[in-house]
Amino acid sequence: RGNRDFHPTPLSSMLVEGCLETGRDVTQGGAVYNSSGVQGVGVADTADSLAAIDEVVFKRKAHTLFEVIDAVKRDFVGRERIRAELLAAPKFGNDLDMPDAYAVLVVRIFRDALSRHTSTRGGPYIPGFYSSTCHVGFGSRTEALPSGRKKGAPFAASLGCCNGSDRQGPTALLNSAAKIDARLAPNGYALNLKFDAPLMKSREAKGVMTALVEGFFARGGMEVQLNVLDPAILIEARDNPGRHPGIVVRVAGYCAYFDEL
């Protein structure tokens, strides 16, 4: 409502289909395509938490749900054994049916929840799953999770897996992501892959990368972005700002100079 009442955009509205015809600004719902994107952050964290509870509490019956909740509330202090078992549970990003099915469920629930509401402009809310850098900020404000994640740790970036959880390589990660119906994310999603530069120098490596990406899209994937970087150079650039001004990294649908991040 603030944009509608105090921040109209007449120039851009002139260039948007529907606004001139209806005599309404885009902030007033004049556009033909009048949707508002809302990003879901923490898909993998939620899926991993559900999978860990399923595995440790219900399948193995190693601990009760009360014991898991108690450990989470304590940030696993004095409950390191429970945390180790939760961390060892199946994780999204490894082409495993259980956590991947939970990720699909989380995405569908998020889509269904948004579909029940409309914006102040009268348009639909549509889901997307890209976090830019807010997965770090959100994680810093969130308590521990049943996935084994400790208080304050970053969430998974966009639609990727949690940090360090992809143990079966990039093909498995892409297979997990491809199980999510891209039609449930009309506002898009981001999936980041990172590779060490020395591994990508040969023609054969580039051919493997091409096949990897093409296979992902053939299975219904929507978006993947690649960072091919030398970790040593990144560390040097971080510790010595200005020494490597030309390093460009992919963030979330856009590129940025590493020095400026």
Task: Give short role names for the model-derived ranges.
Residues 1-261:
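Acidic, glycine-enriched catalytic cores built around paired aspartates
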